[in-house]
Amino acid sequence: VLHEREIVTLIGPNGAGKSTLIKVLLGIVHPNIGEIKTTKPLKFSYVPQKFNPSHSLPLRVKDLLALEKCDPVIKQEIIHDTGISKLENSKVQQLSGGERQRVLLARALLRQPDILVLDEPMQGLDIQSEAELYDYVRSLPAKYGCAVLTVSHDLQWVMQGTHRVVCLNKHICCSG
């Protein structure tokens, strides 16, 4: 169960089913058993663990953001809040890991999701970028009214940034 404005983190060893569960939630694959039940239709946004666009497809940050239609005022607020204002004319392929994560997070937020799914959002970030992203992600449920579902191996995030943890190992081992 995932509640509105809640941050839940999935943890577990490699092969535990974290990515599969995300794919089921996003509708990419169908579950072998069981089903996903919701009280209303939900809008998801997903930030992948890795995003490496081809160098043969020159894509600027503003072009990537333009793929998602959004109120211009909300768009500018998200661009400001994620700290990517100065990156809008940059090519996505040339961004650092932290910059790319912030751009992907901004794009996901432009959808105004009910549930924001972040797959290892801190991976590859320097300590400063990680701390800034932690703080920002913690603010998202209150600011945008969305639930946040993360996959993480970062125990600091699990202990400090999460309302609830779900431990997987081919099934839900525990939750709390």
Kindly label every feature range from the protein language model:
Residues 26:
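Helix-to-loop junction immediately C-terminal to a conserved catalytic motif
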Residues 72-88:
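Conserved ABC ATPase "signature" region
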Residues 91-95, 99:
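Conserved ABC ATPase signature
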Residues 105:
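Hydrophobic anchor residue at the start of the ABC signature
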Residues 116-120:
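Catalytic Walker B motif of ABC-type/P-loop ATPase nucleotide-binding domains
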Residues 152-153:
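H-loop/switch region of ABC-family ATPase nucleotide-binding domains
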Residues 165-176:
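H-loop (His-switch) and adjacent beta-strand-loop-beta switch element
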